[in-house]
Structures are given as structure tokens and as C-alpha cells.
UniProtKB/Swiss-Prot annotation:
Similarity section: Belongs to the GatC family.
Function: Allows the formation of correctly charged Asn-tRNA(Asn) or Gln-tRNA(Gln) through the transamidation of misacylated Asp-tRNA(Asn) or Glu-tRNA(Gln) in organisms which lack either or both of asparaginyl-tRNA or glutaminyl-tRNA synthetases. The reaction takes place in the presence of glutamine and ATP through an activated phospho-Asp-tRNA(Asn) or phospho-Glu-tRNA(Gln).
Sorted UniProt keywords: ATP-binding, Ligase, Nucleotide-binding, Protein biosynthesis
Source lineage: Bacteria, Pseudomonadati, Pseudomonadota, Betaproteobacteria, Neisseriales
Name of the featured protein: Aspartyl/glutamyl-tRNA(Asn/Gln) amidotransferase subunit C
Domain of life: Bacteria
Source organism: Chromobacterium violaceum (strain ATCC 12472 / DSM 30191 / JCM 1249 / CCUG 213 / NBRC 12614 / NCIMB 9131 / NCTC 9757 / MK)
């Protein structure tokens, strides 16, 4: 697949991007190079190769679930403008 200058101009128009004629030519060349690379990659036979989530086979180390901060709820609610039954009260903003 290759894009023509008209294709790039149409895509730019649809995307509402102002592109000069010089930029259209350069962009068409760049996109066609990308499409060529994609065609080369698709030509590679990958049958029998298992997909990878990451290029390196690394297992994640899990850490213990430990509380690292003290419970300061009462201190925060002591300085709050309004609190009711342990909940912060805020003004209604949407009717």
C-alpha cells in the first residue's frame, strides 16, 4: 500500500491540519517508508512463536501488603468545616 500526495492532502484536510505542498510530499514519503517497513515485518513467518508480553522474561516480585502510614482520619476531620458520622460534608454543586 502506498499513499499518493492526494491521499495525504485529504487526510490532512479531514484532520483539519494545514499542510504545505512540501510537507505533503515529505509526509507521503515518510508514511510510505513506514508502510514498507510494516510489509517487511508482516512477511516474517511467525507461526509457532508464542506472543510475548515483554521482551525479557522477568517475573514480578510481590511485596508484602503492609500499612506504611498511620490512620489520621480524626485529625483531618477535626479541621474539616463539616463532618457527620465520620464523613466529610461538602456543599451541593449539581442540582
Amino acid at each position: 500500500m502506498s499513499l499518493t500526495h492526494q491521499d495525504v492532502a485529504r487526510i490532512a484536510k479531514l484532520a483539519r491540519i494545514n499542510v504545505s505542498e512540501a510537507e505533503i510530499a515529505a509526509t507521503a514519503d515518510q508514511l510510505n517508508n513506514i508502510f514498507g517497513l510494516i510489509e517487511k515485518m508482516q512477511a516474517v513467518d511467525t507461526a509457532g512463536i508464542e506472543p510475548m508480553a515483554h521482551p525479557q522474561d522477568v517475573s514480578l516480585r510481590l511485596r508484602d501488603d503492609v500499612v506504611t502510614e498511620p490512620n489520621r482520619r480524626e485529625a483531618f476531620q477535626a479541621v474539616a468545616p463539616q463532618v457527620e458520622k465520620g464523613l466529610f460534608l461538602v456543599p451541593k454543586v449539581i442540582e
